[in-house]
Amino acid sequence: MQYRDLRDFLAQLERIGELRRIRVPVSPRLEMTEVCDRLLRAEGPAVVFERPADGAQTYDMPVLANLFGTPRRVALGMGAESLDELRDVGRLLSALKEPEPPRGLREAGKLWTMAKAVWDMAPRKVSSPACQEIVLEGDDVDLSRIPVQTCWPGDAAPLVTWGLVVTRGPHKKRQNLGIYRQQVINRNQVIMRWLAHRGGALDFREHAIAHPGQPFPIAVALGADPATILGAVTPVPDTLSEYQFAGLLRGSRTELAQCLTPSLAQAQLQVPAGAEIVLEGHIQPDPAHPSGYQHALEGPFGDHTGYYNEQDWFPVFTVERITMRRDPIYHSTYTGKPPDEPAVLGVALNEVFVPLLQKQFPEIADFYLPPEGCSYRMALVSMKKQYAGHAKRVMFGVWSFLRQFMYTKFIVVVDDDVDLRDWKEVIWAITTRVDPARDTVMVENTPIDYLDFASPVSGLGSKMGIDATNKWPGETTREWGQPIVMDAAVKSRVDAMWETLFQ
């Protein structure tokens, strides 16, 4: 599906029955979460809440939710028509990440065509962007005008969830795009929860070292087009900007707007020109804090793990200017025990990961991140095993290949006769092909998800690899079991007589 911006995408979804409008009042406090949770579990449509209201408080701004509630809508957002086509996106990324030298004129021509397609999708800056049709400054900056969801009963405050955070480090040629949740703490401030290894946090750290005591500029785009949002969570090669990749997905160049705040413009921060809402501002200095910048205690919030997370200190982003389109739409979601939108995204992005992994490890037959494992904490790999110890090589290869797998706690490797998408098959392989002492690999003191309260230390924990492949000589001295398989001729004869057996 090709589209210009979020509104064009929503119009196309509505035409094919993938979006519904809710015209009765629904509260952004808890009620929207419950509605969307039921819709997502039923594989229902995206929704626009046209009359958000919380008690006596009403909002003029509609709320878009459950946009990525099915794998098909994720695929449509990435310019594909089905989940299967996302493998092609992965093949494109693998070719861009590690292009192979052409072996002849025909392959050279294909390489040139791909390079030209990437070049033609370079983003372009526009002078009168839709995202700046309305500009709020000074006392008019008030986040309470936006119907930000409070998702769960124990949440500390309303939480911005789909904010596309744009930063640039002092020594970086390109901007970083990231999705980080933001706790609203007053009319013009949010807590920016980014983990230490994420691009935004790294840019901030480099800025604090290079320019201590100077405000750090940030822009947050709310209601960006799906391709740009999904580009921010996809393993785009370092040689390609997320905006350029979004153009490839969408089928048209990404249009960008220069931020209006002078320091943000000086930092060359650019946001999607068609974004519904843009927050411009800074993380301000605070000499009293050890980091030299304002921080606040964030959380607790219900998270994609299905639990409330611990509180921790994160930087405070002060919003100094809000720009928006006329009649803006606020894009929101919730996170909770799978399935939720991050889990659905994980299912879709899984198809993108497979060709990337296969390019590096041709022996991998399939790869699956089960959504029940919080989308990334468990990985299943099937492989064409070629030698003793091969499964362990694949385990460590997966852990180290993409940043997205840094927090994967469990990897189970099976032979290619096992269907990874069928838990019955996986459990059968584990229980029949694994000796716990011989086939379990434990790795201690590795980076782990900050939200993983099961780890002994925040951000540092262990990983487990399980080799559930058939064992080769050198791995066992015993005669290995042969799977029971019915004779093909017998199966064929029974197929032919099946309809007559029960007449």
Swiss-Prot record:
Its cofactor is prenylated FMN; Mn(2+). It is an enzyme of class 4 (lyase). Its EC number is 4.1.1.98. Prenylated FMN binds at residues 179-181, 193-195, 198-199. The active site is at 303 (proton donor). InterPro entries: UbiD (IPR002830), UbiD-like_C (IPR049381), UbiD-like_N (IPR049383), UbiD_bacteria (IPR023677), UbiD_Rift_dom (IPR048304). Pathway: Cofactor biosynthesis; ubiquinone biosynthesis. One of its GO terms (cellular component) is plasma membrane. It is found in: Cell membrane. Mn(2+) binds at residues 176, 242. It is a peripheral membrane protein. Keywords: Cell membrane, Decarboxylase, Flavoprotein, FMN, Lyase, Manganese, Membrane, Metal-binding, Ubiquinone biosynthesis. Its main location: membrane. It comes from the Bacteria. One of its GO terms (molecular function) is 3-octaprenyl-4-hydroxybenzoate carboxy-lyase activity. The keyword Glycoprotein does not apply. Binds 1 prenylated FMN per subunit. PANTHER family: 3-OCTAPRENYL-4-HYDROXYBENZOATE CARBOXY-LYASE-RELATED, FERULIC ACID DECARBOXYLASE 1. Catalyzes the decarboxylation of 3-octaprenyl-4-hydroxy benzoate to 2-octaprenylphenol, an intermediate step in ubiquinone biosynthesis. Homohexamer. Belongs to the UbiD family. This is 3-octaprenyl-4-hydroxybenzoate carboxy-lyase. The gene is ubiD.
